[in-house]
Curated annotation (Swiss-Prot):
Name of the protein described by the UniProt record: Methionine aminopeptidase 2-1
Catalytic activity: Release of N-terminal amino acids, preferentially methionine, from peptides and arylamides
PANTHER family xrefs: METHIONINE AMINOPEPTIDASE 2
Record-linked Pfam families: Peptidase_M24
Region Disordered, residue ranges: 1-90
Compositional bias of kind Low complexity: 22-33, 47-58, 75-88
Annotated keywords: Aminopeptidase, Cytoplasm, Hydrolase, Metal-binding, Protease
SUPFAM superfamilies: Creatinase/aminopeptidase (SSF55920), Winged helix' DNA-binding domain (SSF46785)
Amino acid sequence: MAAQASEKLEKLDLNGQNGESAAGPAKAGQADAGEVEDESDDDADDAGAAADGAANGAAKKKKKRKSKKKKKGGAKVQSSPPRVPVSSLFANGQYPEGEIVEYKNENSYRTTNEEKRYLDRMNNDFLQEYRQGAEVHRQVRQYAQKNIKPGQTLTEIAEGIEDSVRALTGHQGLEEGDNIKGGMGFPCGLSINHCAAHYTPNAGNKMVLQQGDVMKVDFGAHINGRIVDSAFTMSFDPVYDPLLEAVKDATNTGIRSLQEAGIDVRMSDIGAAIQETMESYEIELNGTTYPIKPIRNLNGHNIDQHVIHGGKSVPIVKGSDQTKMEEGEVFAIETFGSTGKGYVREDMETSHYALVANAPQVPLRLSSAKSLLNVINKNFGTLPWCRRYLDRLGQDKYLLGLNNLVQSGIVQDYPPLCDIKGSYTAQFEHTIVLRPTVKEVISRGDDY
């Protein structure tokens, strides 16, 4: 989820499953296929029948029964669409590591230092929660990348991703407090073309994904407030490939900057490296060549527990910020590229909101605002949410109360952020954990 570099946002301290299907045996529909049927009776001829016609008749062998053996079920696999909780797929509670990168230069001692290794072991629960969320993100986005097609509505796409995240985390978010334990870290953003961030459809939205669209897919999964924030861009026309490649390369450059310095790296150094990479690309559209520009007022950010924007920003252009990254911090390294001006403004209908952490006590006169604030506190806490989430909880006629909460400074609204119309924007993002001994790109996958 993007952090906007503006005075308004810098002061923020944000913190239905359809058709459940279980993973079955390797060969579905062959129940008891491994059972061994009883052997048929073996009749033996009466050995003395022809010789003496003995009264005892034929001697028969007794039946031999073999015990029934049932075929063991195969290992559980993810369903399609994803509905099997990852906790069922990793029953031992140990989830895959992200990309592990050793510290270099003045921090290289951390990899083997006994004190740092001890601190790393003490962080196991913290890391397993992050890795579980990252595995949820990987499995959901793998399905999304294969199945999102032009002609689908944005509502259909967003709800499909969100339902999958809830299923895989094991938190449907319909009971009070459940979404705070796990589930969506923030609403699924589906920002199209010149819109760079913070767009998700509200109820009744009929927008359809088109063949020529460039769509940013930005969503978060969390376990116990450990938010994994990762994003990618989809297009269906190879003409946009240079734009996507530029932004992906810029994001990886930002991550490499961490690999070289990591702990104690200055934010300004990361921004300069990202800008240099991004601006080395260009794209030709309809016979015109456009330089690819970093969107200078969008940033990466650090992540705290239940807080998506923790207070530190990671710029994507050169600047003078001397703030350093510190041991134990978690960062979302994200970059945005544009064929337009490289600057975004608030535009279009707002869908994203979040409770302002440590907001001052303000008397609310509207009963609808008081009631809505109670719902927000019990269901989302400081996690971001959107109007569709209120609809899902059965809330209605809440807009007046919601606007009152925004005007009172209790809730922050996040309007979509857009470059000039006619331009195209792209985004790639990963979550990084600065462990005492190594850096871990927690959300890294085979896709990006």
